[in-house]
């Protein structure tokens, strides 16, 4: 059971209109034959899988991509009838359930096809199982690596009375978000070499994650897996500029729960790692590393009533402390991600401070923090 903190003043706010705008801007770059499938894995990158999926559908997304079968089942349970592709490997034992729920699976080995076919036959499943063949062109994660392996799989899928529907074929580029396109070109050449053995391509041919779609449009195929950019986050971080403005959808706010005057020489938080050099005002914010706000963010800053305030002392499990410029009333707004007045703190800012990527920060926001949606 997940307990959501409905009775404390800390929340994630998700702007669904920003998500719709990002999708609309992306679709405006494509021809009308190219479909956009919204990637809503990992609880919609921390934004909320069901609410994001609904917004994406309203904006024109015609399908969804997830990482695990349970995410696809959650979408079906919520009433979504659109195509859903599970991008990770699903155990063959679940093939009958997948076929029943009309879900598509990524497949990367002949052994998987052989095992799943036997299981489908043993369970007398007559509904075809939708398959997208994954090609490993250089990501090194999952997929067929040689033309011979791929040709064998295609032959299996096209046998008479096959229990499979050969619905799609795809790859994933590892460096599409980098200015140096050397390795991208290497992968693209591998893709062309592999796919040449498929004499008749399936309905969906897709190579584009957000980065590929933004900066390598010439090889888009006929479907885009629109992921992190859907949420208004630049997949390249600060290295490449997006061809159109991305609107971040997520903000994280709280309110001060305690304010005190700290005397010079007094310390704050575990380990007494911060000691006041002079008398100062300290505010307590009801969020901590159990909420996904990293312990390593000591020394970073938040916005209190539009002013930057440093996080002092170690971030605790459920609370953190900030140094205030002056006495501020309990209940004052604290912005941890987002804009207050003329100042902004982005997920990218936090990621830079933590030495990671904004994906990790967004996905790490715990379900204990309630999500509030505006549209």
UniProtKB/Swiss-Prot annotation:
CDD domains: PLPDE_III_AR (cd00430). The gene is alr. It catalyses: L-alanine = D-alanine. This is Alanine racemase. The lineage of its organism: Bacteria, Bacillati, Bacillota, Bacilli, Lactobacillales. SUPFAM superfamilies: Alanine racemase C-terminal domain-like (SSF50621), PLP-binding barrel (SSF51419). It comes from the Bacteria. Coiled coil: none annotated. The active site is at 41 (proton acceptor), 270 (proton acceptor). Its EC number is 5.1.1.1. Belongs to the alanine racemase family. The keyword RNA-binding does not apply. Pathway: Amino-acid biosynthesis; D-alanine biosynthesis; D-alanine from L-alanine: step 1/1. Its cofactor is pyridoxal 5'-phosphate. Keywords: Isomerase, Pyridoxal phosphate.
């Amino acid at each position: 059971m997940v307990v959501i903190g409905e009775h404390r003043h800390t929340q994630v706010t998700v702007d669904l209109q920003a998500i719709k705008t990002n999708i609309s801007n992306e679709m405006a770059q494509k021809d009308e034959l190219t479909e956009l499938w919204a990637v809503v894995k990992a609880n919609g990158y921390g934004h909320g899988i069901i609410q994001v999926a609904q917004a994406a559908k309203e904006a024109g997304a015609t399908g969804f991509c997830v990482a695990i079968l349970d995410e696809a089942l959650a979408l079906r349970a919520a009433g979504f009838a659109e195509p859903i592709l599970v991008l990770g490997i699903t155990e063959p034992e679940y093939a009958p359930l997948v076929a029943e729920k009309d879900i598509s699976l990524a497949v990367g080995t002949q052994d998987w096809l052989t095992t799943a076919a036997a299981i489908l036959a043993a369970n007398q499943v007559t509904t075809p199982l939708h398959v997208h063949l994954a090609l490993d062109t250089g990501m090194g994660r999952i997929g067929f690596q040689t033309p011979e392996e791929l040709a064998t799989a295609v032959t299996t899928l096209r046998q008479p009375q096959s229990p499979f529907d050969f619905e799609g074929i795809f790859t994933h580029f590892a460096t599409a978000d980098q200015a140096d396109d050397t390795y991208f070109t290497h992968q693209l050449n591998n893709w062309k070499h592999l796919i040449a053995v498929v004499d008749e391509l399936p309905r969906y041919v897709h190579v584009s994650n957000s980065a590929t779609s933004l900066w390598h449009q010439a090889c888009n195929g006929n479907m885009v897996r629109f992921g992190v950019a859907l949420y208004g986050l630049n997949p390249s971080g600060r290295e490449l500029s997006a061809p159109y403005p991305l609107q971040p959808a997520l903000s994280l706010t709280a309110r001060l729960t305690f304010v005190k005057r700290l005397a010079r020489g007094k310390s704050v938080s575990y380990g007494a790692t911060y000691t006041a050099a002079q008398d100062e005002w300290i505010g307590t914010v009801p969020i901590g590393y159990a909420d996904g706000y990293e312990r390593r963010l000591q020394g970073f800053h938040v916005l209190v009533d539009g002013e930057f305030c440093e996080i002092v002392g170690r971030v605790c499990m459920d609370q953190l402390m900030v140094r205030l410029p002056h006495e501020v009333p309990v209940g004052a707004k604290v912005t941890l991600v987002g804009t207050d007045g003329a100042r902004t703190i982005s997920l990218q800012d936090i990621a830079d401070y933590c030495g990671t990527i904004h994906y990790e920060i967004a996905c790490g926001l715990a379900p204990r923090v309630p999500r509030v949606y505006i549209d």
